[in-house]
Amino acid sequence: MKIVAFAGSSSKESINKKLVTYVAEQFPNVEKEILDLNDYEMPIFSVDREKHEGIPTLALEFAEKIDSADLLLIALAEHNSTYTAAFKNIFDWISRIKDRKHFGGKNVFLLATAPGPAGGRHVV
């Protein structure tokens, strides 16, 4: 079994990255890969950009990582009562890959935490 985990945040000090890393560590004797969205920074999605430039290589590489997993652990950061622009952008790009489900039809364990009073509940 392989777990691929990531936080939907581009913050270097992301509490959601800490959370998803901690949760991944609770699965002993399982192959784990923790992704950092900063390693997959790409242009803001637009249909026009896709038409002229195609899907960015980094989006394809991120999708391959997702496809390699048996289980996805995702901890979503909350910005202004919604998920982050970084997560939305990568989600938009991978959703455009032909004949592919957004998260490859994988099982997803969704987490969130936030320091505010909502505690991340708007994104789960």
Kindly label every feature range from the protein language model.
Residues 1-99:
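N-terminal beta1-alpha1-beta2 submodule of the flavodoxin-like/Rossmannoid cofactor-binding fold
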Residues 104-124:
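Short, glycine-/small-residue-rich phosphate/pyrophosphate-handling segment
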